[in-house]
A protein has these predicted regions:
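Aromatic- and carboxylate-enriched substrate-binding clefts and catalytic-loop regions
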Residues: 68-220
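Carbohydrate-recognition beta-sandwich/jelly-roll modules
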Residues: 1-70, 101-103, 107-111
Length: 220
């Protein structure tokens, strides 16, 4: 990361043990929050090309061996197109995502979807997001300006309708930690006026905050 500032404040946390150092660091930043207990459990991800039946078969193997699974992650093959993303279920692999998700929840298994923030031209969001996006593409996908309320609303409404309303419990946000050659250059522009460099350095946190605040927390 780069900070355009004439000075730098350095804060050092010390303690008698690593635990004490981490405790002081957490308290300095407000104390943190305890995630749901299932979030601290055992996570497993399946292959990107798996369909619903293959996911269930793999989870049954764990069950037969008395190995508890708390969360299963679906790599981006659950979507019609990725990466960039449509955020829409690939119906050949997951013909009935609502039933699939409910069956997992009945077994105490949460569903976590892998995605990145960039919009595929095949997505039904593409046209609406086009004027709300940056000047450069990432892998031919739009880079929405998620500082804009309208862009946030478009994505979170779609996520609620297609994912959260049927029981999806979370997301693995991918490909938000790159540099100028991997994502977009410093001279990229965004509708909000945020610079390309500042947007790139904060994009992952912006996406996380949006999904938590505008989606999970807002809709309980």
């Amino acid at each position: 990361a780069q900070v355009n500032s004439p000075g730098l404040e350095l804060i050092v946390f010390s303690g008698n043990s690593i635990l004490e150092v981490v405790q002081r660091y957490n308290l300095f930043h407000g104390g943190g929050a305890l995630p749901p207990l299932w979030g601290l459990g055992f996570w497993h991800r399946v292959h990107a090309t798996f369909n619903a039946d293959q996911v269930k078969e793999e989870l049954e193997d764990f069950e037969e061996r008395n190995f508890p699974i708390d969360v299963v992650g679906l790599e981006p093959g659950w979507m019609t197109k990725s990466y960039p993303c449509t955020f829409e279920w690939q119906k050949k692999r997951f013909p009935d995502p609502a039933t699939f998700t409910r069956e997992l929840l009945d077994k105490g298994i949460r569903l976590n979807l892998w995605e990145n923030p960039y919009i595929s031209k095949s997505s039904r969001l593409y046209e609406s997001m086009y004027p709300l996006s940056g000047s450069h593409l990432v892998w031919l996908g739009l880079v929405p300006d998620y500082t804009l309320p309208q862009a946030r609303r478009l994505l979170t409404d779609q996520h609620h309708e297609d994912h959260i309303s049927i029981g999806v419990s979370g997301y693995k946000i991918d490909e938000v930690d790159g540099y100028d050659f991997w994502l977009w250059p410093d001279h990229a522009t965004f509708p909000s006026g945020v610079s390309g460099e500042a947007m790139r350095q904060s994009y992952g946190l912006l996406m996380q905050n949006m999904l938590y605040t505008d989606l999970f927390k807002k809709r309980n």
